[in-house]
């Protein structure tokens, strides 16, 4: 059992080191996009499936509540939380449209979308990003593996350099915390 624990922790450390080498400048760019969005009176919409849905909710909560610093709430909405909307849209239009229909209803030009998918290929995330691009939203991705189709649809896609879903998810929430810190410091300064 100790070997497994050691191996998992080492894999986490290696993924963290690779992520730091490859993505640090892009994380700063994403933070700037988020700050620009918020300072111009727009909002951030986040979405994903499973663990990525939980990450979307977590990030939205850090922004609307607070991360570390006492400040005004920032407009961020997780499109994963309204069970009535999710089930109605899923029933009437299919599960692939559960996020794109909400983007159509809630997003405006200048808003920022954050699509989260460890593969970069979740159909409902891709359709939401496509809808966001049509509207004129800034599109950001948190993905893994090679980034999938999200590479084409995102202004910036933060692709975690791993094929292991748990490692990708760990880096997503780490980068999310870094982004929340940077936004909190700069969006209300």
Curated annotation (Swiss-Prot):
Location in the cell reads: Cytoplasm
* One Pfam family cited in the UniProt record for this chain: SIS_2
InterPro entries assigned: GmhA/DiaA, Phosphoheptose_Isoase, SIS_dom, SIS_dom_sf, SIS_GmhA/DiaA_subfam
| Binding-site list for substrate | 49-51, 62, 91-92, 117-119, 122, 169
Q: Which residues belong to any copy of the SIS domain?
A: 34-189
List the record's Gene Ontology CC terms alphabetically.
cytoplasm
Which prosthetic group or cofactor does it need? Zn(2+)
Q: In which pathway does it act?
A: Carbohydrate biosynthesis; D-glycero-D-manno-heptose 7-phosphate biosynthesis; D-glycero-alpha-D-manno-heptose 7-phosphate and D-glycero-beta-D-manno-heptose 7-phosphate from sedoheptulose 7-phosphate: step 1/1
Q: Bound how, and how many: what does the cofactor note say?
A: Binds 1 zinc ion per subunit.
Q: What does this protein do?
A: Catalyzes the isomerization of sedoheptulose 7-phosphate in D-glycero-D-manno-heptose 7-phosphate.
| Extra facts | The reaction produces a racemic mixture of D-glycero-alpha-D-manno-heptose 7-phosphate and D-glycero-beta-D-manno-heptose 7-phosphate.
* PANTHER family associated with the record: DNAA INITIATOR-ASSOCIATING PROTEIN DIAA (PTHR30390:SF6), SEDOHEPTULOSE 7-PHOSPHATE ISOMERASE / DNAA INITIATOR-ASSOCIATING FACTOR FOR REPLICATION INITIATION (PTHR30390)
| Listed name of the protein | Phosphoheptose isomerase
Q: Which organism is it from?
A: Wolinella succinogenes (strain ATCC 29543 / DSM 1740 / CCUG 13145 / JCM 31913 / LMG 7466 / NCTC 11488 / FDC 602W)
């Amino acid at each position: 059992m100790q070997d497994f624990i050691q191996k998992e922790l080492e894999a986490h450390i290696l993924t963290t080191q690779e992520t730091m080498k490859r993505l640090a400048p892009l994380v700063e760019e994403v933070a700037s996009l988020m700050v620009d969005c918020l300072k111009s009176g727009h909002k951030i919409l986040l979405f994903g499936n499973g663990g990525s849905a939980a990450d979307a909710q977590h990030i939205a909560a850090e922004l609307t509540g607070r991360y570390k610093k006492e400040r005004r709430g920032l407009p961020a909405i997780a499109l994963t939380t309204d069970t009535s909307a999710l089930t109605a849209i899923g029933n009437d239009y299919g599960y692939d449209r559960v996020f794109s229909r909400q983007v159509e209803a809630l997003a405006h030009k200048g808003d920022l979308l954050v699509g989260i998918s460890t593969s970069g290929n979740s159909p409902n995330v891709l359709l939401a990003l496509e809808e966001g691009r049509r509207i004129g939203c800034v599109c950001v991705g948190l993905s893994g593996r090679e980034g999938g189709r999200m590479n084409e649809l995102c202004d910036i896609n933060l692709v975690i350099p791993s094929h292991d879903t748990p490692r990708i998810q760990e880096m997503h929430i780490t980068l999310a915390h870094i982004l929340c810190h940077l936004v909190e410091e700069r969006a209300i300064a």
